[in-house]
Curated annotation (Swiss-Prot):
A GO molecular function held by the record: mRNA binding
Lineage, top ranks: Bacteria, Bacillati, Actinomycetota, Actinomycetes, Mycobacteriales
NCBIfam families: rplM_bact
Subunit text: Part of the 50S ribosomal subunit.
Pfam family, one: Ribosomal_L13
Function statement: This protein is one of the early assembly proteins of the 50S ribosomal subunit, although it is not seen to bind rRNA by itself. It is important during the early stages of 50S assembly.
InterPro entries according to UniProt: Ribosomal_uL13, Ribosomal_uL13_bac-type, Ribosomal_uL13_CS, Ribosomal_uL13_sf
Name of this chain's protein: Large ribosomal subunit protein uL13
PROSITE patterns: RIBOSOMAL_L13
Species: Rhodococcus jostii (strain RHA1)
Stored PANTHER family: LARGE RIBOSOMAL SUBUNIT PROTEIN UL13M (PTHR11545:SF2), RIBOSOMAL PROTEIN L13 (PTHR11545)
Length: 147
């Protein structure tokens, strides 16, 4: 008997909603990345986009452990000489909490065409409301580790 290889048409996708309230950012990102890639399914294959949709709510209430709120910086460059900009994690969390959570999760996905397709299934919202109620998302509980 030959080994089963999943095809793109064989995939059934479910919607998961994760509440990010008081969940450490890195632990949230690991769980969401595994759901997006489909690593929780027995039919996982690294070359097939077999993951589920993930909706994250309350991104503004995510926990940042340690001194990372003031001590860790995110950088980007304009492309011009002297154009390096930096912001602390706390500044980004106050201004765009959904981007901070999205950047943490997308950084754990493959850096290729498949990774870009997988990241389109991630939806992050700063508040408790989301427009995906029609998809009937299943709540996903993250087991909390003592901080």
């Amino acid at each position: 008997m030959s080994t089963y290889t999943p095809k793109a048409g064989d995939v059934t996708r479910t919607w998961h909603v994760i509440d990010a309230t008081d969940v450490v950012l890195g632990r949230l990102a690991v769980q969401a990345a595994n759901l997006l890639r489909g690593k929780h399914k027995p039919t996982f294959a690294p070359h097939v986009d077999g993951g589920d949709f993930v909706v994250i709510i309350n991104a503004e209430k995510v926990a940042i452990s340690g001194n990372k709120r003031e001590g860790k910086f995110l950088y980007h460059h304009s492309g011009h000489p002297g154009g390096l900009k930096s912001r602390s994690v706390g500044e980004v969390l106050d201004k765009n909490p959904d981007r901070l959570v999205e950047k943490a999760i997308v950084g754990m996905l493959p850096k290729n065409k498949l990774g870009r397709a997988i990241s389109s299934k991630l939806k992050v919202y700063a508040g408790p409301n989301h427009p995906h109620a029609a998809q009937q998302p299943v709540p996903f509980e993250i087991k909390q580790v003592a901080q």
